[in-house]
């Protein structure tokens, strides 16, 4: 059983993608599971955070600032190309895709993956919360700009998106906090002090929910590609742009983490539990791994959900 679980953990990404691609006829109809699965992924991720114990790092703010700068830069370059092209270059879809690649929050499974690589689960979980909060605040203002409509005013479109996006990002955090307060309050009334923690199985739950969701998403992506209305060169440009954005974010994240490492010593208990060798990593090594995953690992499920709104 342990060997089977290790195999699934190692090759889960490939297995999920293959199942989703070849089983697209069946799994494409499970799109309604997207929102509940995203909610649960965020809920279990936030359950690992005690809001009173949040530790902010320098690289948290630097990564967020660079992320926003890249988004604004892509928007500026995109609109400049549209202007000089005199409306002949249709790059609106490419522009939307690039912005989504950049602005999407960190994947909920990223802390688990970072832990397996030797990074800091604590620091990345904290950044995941910050990243989701940033997305909830920024995305509603970006979408009306990326997809302007003559029928809906800017602030009306912004409000509609805010009502759809923010609850999915904020409610899991609030629910996790309520569960923690109720659990710890119950034990205090009994005269005992017990902190709310997740065991290894429940702490890994976002990873397995992500795998399940990835199957559904790959099925829907396959269905979309088979019925695509764009020309081949346009698809190539979108894929190339996404690849460049992915490599750039991983590289920048790793550089920022190495250049501005966390200022605390030692390894978190969860890090050692998942990867015993993490205790031997230096602060710079742990921060490089953690920041790289924080910037490069994106919540693809949330991005596709937003793109289909």
Predicted regions and their residues:
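Alpha-helical transmembrane segments of multi-pass small-molecule/ion transporters
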Residues: 1-309
């Amino acid at each position: 059983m342990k060997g089977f679980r290790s195999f699934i953990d190692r090759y889960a990404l490939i297995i999920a993608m293959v199942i989703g691609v070849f089983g697209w006829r069946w799994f494409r109809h499970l799109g309604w599971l997207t929102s509940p699965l995203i909610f649960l992924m965020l809920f279990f991720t936030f359950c690992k955070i005690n809001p009173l114990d949040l530790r902010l790092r320098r690289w948290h703010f630097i990564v967020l600032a660079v992320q926003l700068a890249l988004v604004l830069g892509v928007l500026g370059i995109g609109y400049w190309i549209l202007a000089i092209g005199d409306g002949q270059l249709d790059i609106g879809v490419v522009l939307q895709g690039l912005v989504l690649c950049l602005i999407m929050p960190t994947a909920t499974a990223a802390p688990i993956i970072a832990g397996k690589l030797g990074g800091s689960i604590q620091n990345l979980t904290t950044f995941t919360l910050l990243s989701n909060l940033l997305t909830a605040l920024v995305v509603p203002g970006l979408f009306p700009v990326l997809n302007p409509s003559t029928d809906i005013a800017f602030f009306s479109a912004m409000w509609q998106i805010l009502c759809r996006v923010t609850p999915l990002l904020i409610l899991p955090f609030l629910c996790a906090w309520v569960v923690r307060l109720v659990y710890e309050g119950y034990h205090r009334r009994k005269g005992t002090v017990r902190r709310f923690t997740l065991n290894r199985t429940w702490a890994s739950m976002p990873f397995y929910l992500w795998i399940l969701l990835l199957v559904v998403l790959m099925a829907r992506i396959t269905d979309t590609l088979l019925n695509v209305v764009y020309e081949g060169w346009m698809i190539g440009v979108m894929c190339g742009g996404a690849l460049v954005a992915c490599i750039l974010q991983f590289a920048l994240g790793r550089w920022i983490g190495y250049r501005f490492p966390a200022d605390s010593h030692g390894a978190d208990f969860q890090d050692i539990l998942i990867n015993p060798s993490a205790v031997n990593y230096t602060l710079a090594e742990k921060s490089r791994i953690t920041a790289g995953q924080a910037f490069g690992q994106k919540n693809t499920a949330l991005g596709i959900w937003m793109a289909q709104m």
